[in-house]
Amino acid sequence: MSKTSRANKYVYFFGGGKADGNESMKNLLGGKGANLAEMAGHPNLRLPVPPGFTVTTEVCTYYYQNKRTYPSVLKTQVQEAISKMEKLTGKKFGDVKNPLLVSIRSGARKSMPGMMETILNAGLTEQTIKGLIEQSGDERFAYDAYRRLIMMYADVVMEKAAGVEPKGGKGIRKVLDEKLEKVKHEKGYASDTDLTAADLKALVKDFKATVKKVLGTEVHDNPNEQLL
């Protein structure tokens, strides 16, 4: 790889028995990203690591050195990585019949237990959930995945990353958790697993309205806007 291409490379792909990086690249890929690359690409391990990609630590550095903006090529590189994932999984990001969903996990050069954030099921929307229900045959599973996305996205992206100060010291995650607990109490449920598909569908609707009321904006219903 040339110096120019390496300097402009911000996304490292792994999957299909191959990986752009390895375990020696923790400064660039973070501990989690480097280890995933090693597991996915090591010829002797042959571990069934699902395809994915790592956005390098250099993007974080760039962001803070350039007035909170991203490298101009980052969006294209992420889209190229998503295309590779689609080819390997047979699913398509944003597709209404067979949607590809992704987990977004933060990482760092050094281990920071309890400090990292996660967003699950990015790519779920009012339209793509229909495909997840069709593919899984489980409406309850699909709406449980959707309500988890809304809770995580509102907390991590719309509040914390946006620098929004929680009203009354109560963050959006706490507000949504209380709504979830209220439904469980009213229905006499002992755990989240007792919630029915109808319960979760109603919670999703309530969560969306609550996020808009508390944070003043809606959860993105476009897969690409969720991701980028």
Residue ranges and their predicted role:
Residues 1-228:
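Nucleotide/phosphate-binding sheet-loop regions of phosphoryl- and nucleotidyl-transfer enzymes
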